[in-house]
C-alpha cells in the first residue's frame, strides 16, 4: 500500500479552497449572455472552444492532490446539476464557490462548522420554498423558445427549433440531437411509432426511389415466436386476402418457406405483404410487441394467452392508416388503437419509470412512452466546421434539457433575479444559535453572486446593478444582453425553476461538506529510485565487449 500524506485543519482547508477557486474561476467566466469562451486542449486535432460550464469543469485536473480534491468536489456540483436539470452548471459552481469562500471566513473566526452547515440548510430550504411561489407554469411555445434561447447562450434560433420540435411531438415526445450535413439547423419529425427494424427481404420494397415498403390501411399481425412454416400462416393469409388489404407481419423472425411464400405472393401481386423482426430483446421485446398491439388495436398472438397462428382471426390483427418499412426502420402511422387503452398503457409505463433503478432502463421506458404518446423529433445541427458543430450541439442539448425542466416545474425570471427575490424569505429564517444565524448570512450573500458574475462578465459594475435590482420587485431585473432594466419575463429572460432550485441545493450540499472537512488524506507522489535508472544506463558498457 502506497504511503499517504495527511493534512489537518487550516492546512487541509486552504488547499481545498485553492482547488475550488481554480475550477470555479475557469467556469464562471462563461456565465450569462456575454459570458466568455474557454479553450480546451485536445490530445489530437484542434482545440475545443466552449461556453458550457460543465464541459469546462470536466476538463480540470490539478497537479496538487489536495487542491484537486477541492476542484473535484465542485466538479461534482456541476455534474449533479447537469444530470438532474440539464443546465445551471455554471450558476451552481458560482453559488458553491460563494458559500465556501464566505463560510471559510466564519470557520477561521472560530465558529462551529456543523452549526454553520445547519444554518445553510435552513436558508436553502426557505429559498427553495420561495422559488416555488415565484414559479409560474411554462405552457406556451413562445416561453419554451425563450427558455431554450437563454440556455443556449442567447441563441434564438436554437430556442425556436426546440419549441417547434416540442410542438410537433408533444412534451413527452422523444427529441434527439445529431450532426447535420448542412450549415443550417434542421428539424425532422417522425409521426406515429417508429422502431429500429427494417424489412427482412428487399423484394418487399414498393417504392424503388425511396427504398421503402409502403402499406396503406394494412392489417398488422404480431407474433412473439419465429415463423418458418407457411402452413401456420395460411389460414390468416387467406382471410386477409379476402379482405383485400395488405399485411404487415411483426414476429421474432420470419424465414425459410414462410418468407419465400410471402415474397412470391408480393411479387405476383396476389397479396401485398411485408415482414419485419420485432424490436428489442427478451422481456423488452414482449413489452414492445404489447405496445404495438395497443397502438394498433390488435392482440399479440402468443401461446401464453392461448392463441396460435393457425387459429388467428382478423379480429386479432391490428390496423393502421399507413405503415412505412425502410431498410432499418419501421414507422406505424395513425394506429387504430383505443385512445383510453393507449393512455392507460402510458400511465403504466410511467409508473415503471418511477420505479426503474438504472438510467438505461429509464431511458428505454421514456422512449416507449414517447412512441405511444407523441412521436420522435430529430434536430440536425448545422455548422461550418467540426469545432463549431461540437460546441453548437452541446448548446442544443443543454437548451433541450432546460426546456424539459421548464415544462416540468415551471419558470422564474432569469438573470440571477429569482435567487435575489428569495432574500427576503431567507432573512426571516431563524437559527437555533448564533452560529446557525451566521450560516443563514452566508447564503444571503451567496444568493447575490450569480447576478454579480453575469454583470461582471458584461463589463459593468456589479454592486450598482445588484442594488438597483434589489430596489425593484417581482420580475424587475437587469437584461445583460441589452443592458436594460425591466420586466425580465416580458423580455423573455427566463430560467426553469428546476434548474435554479437544483443549482442552489447541489451547491449548498457540497459547500456544506467542504466547510465541515477537518482532515484530508492523499497518496504521496511516487519517487523513481535512482538506482534502477543508473544500473540500466551501465549496460551501455557491454558494447565494449567486442575486441
Curated annotation (Swiss-Prot):
ATP binds at residues 30-33, 51, 87-91, 415, 479-481, 495. It catalyses: ATP + H2O + a folded polypeptide = ADP + phosphate + an unfolded polypeptide. One of its GO terms (cellular component) is cytoplasm. Residues 532-547 have a biased composition (Gly residues). Its EC number is 5.6.1.7. Residues 525-547 are annotated as: Disordered. The keyword NAD does not apply. It is found in: Cytoplasm. GO terms for biological process: protein refolding. One of its GO terms (molecular function) is isomerase activity. InterPro entries: Chaperonin_Cpn60_CS, Cpn60/GroEL, Cpn60/GroEL/TCP-1, GroEL-like_apical_dom_sf, GROEL-like_equatorial_sf, TCP-1-like_intermed_sf. Keywords: ATP-binding, Chaperone, Cytoplasm, Isomerase, Nucleotide-binding. It holds the Pfam family Cpn60_TCP1. It is an enzyme of class 5 (isomerase). NCBIfam families: GroEL (TIGR02348), PRK00013.1 (NF000592), PRK12849.1 (NF009487), PRK12850.1 (NF009488), PRK12851.1 (NF009489). Forms a cylinder of 14 subunits composed of two heptameric rings stacked back-to-back. Interacts with the co-chaperonin GroES. Belongs to the chaperonin (HSP60) family. Together with its co-chaperonin GroES, plays an essential role in assisting protein folding. The GroEL-GroES system forms a nano-cage that allows encapsulation of the non-native substrate proteins and provides a physical environment optimized to promote and accelerate protein folding. PANTHER family: 60 KDA HEAT SHOCK PROTEIN, MITOCHONDRIAL. This is Chaperonin GroEL. It comes from Nitrosomonas eutropha (strain DSM 101675 / C91 / Nm57). The gene is groEL.
